[in-house]
Regions:
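Juxtamembrane/disordered regions of integral membrane proteins
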Residues: 1-144
Length: 144
């Protein structure tokens, strides 16, 4: 993997990073909404807010958010890397770094603090972008 940034199609890298961050954010909200809806039906009414807040800040929900961030980063990194013929791994890695910056900004804006779980999300976003680029690079090498 060479670090020649002139071969990267930057528009697709930015689009891939935005797709990765938005996908992670929307899927996390969908999981939280689905959980609240199920609990609302089980309790036959509006669930207590304290119970929902306690569930959403619990460790399993945070881990689900990190996994969803990884999935979004892989998709965004692969999307950015598919357009780069010369260096798909670098395009995926840069898309992952940009997605990590967006995830960091969203987490800091939502929670107001940067904690260990935010650091884990950022690391997973960078690694997910790199994996997406590697998958796209492997696909382009086998198709030649």
């Amino acid at each position: 993997m060479s670090f020649d940034f002139s071969t990267i199609k930057w528009s697709w890298v930015v689009i891939g990073a935005i797709v990765a961050a938005v996908l992670a954010f929307v899927l996390t909200l969908a999981v939280q909404f689905g959980y609240g809806l199920v609990i609302g039906f089980q309790l036959r009414g509006t669930p207590p807010q304290e119970m929902l807040i306690e569930a959403f800040i619990s460790t399993p929900f945070i881990i689900v958010g990190i996994v969803i961030t990884a999935i979004g980063a892989v998709i965004g990194g692969r999307m950015a890397a598919r357009r780069s013929e010369d260096n798909p791994q670098l395009a995926g890695l840069v898309a992952g770094v940009l997605a990590a910056a967006l995830v960091l900004a969203l987490r800091a804006w939502q929670w107001g603090v940067v904690d260990v779980w935010t650091l884990a999300s950022v690391i997973v976003a960078v690694l997910g972008g790199w994996v997406g680029g590697r998958l796209a690079g492997r696909r382009s090498q086998t198709s030649l």
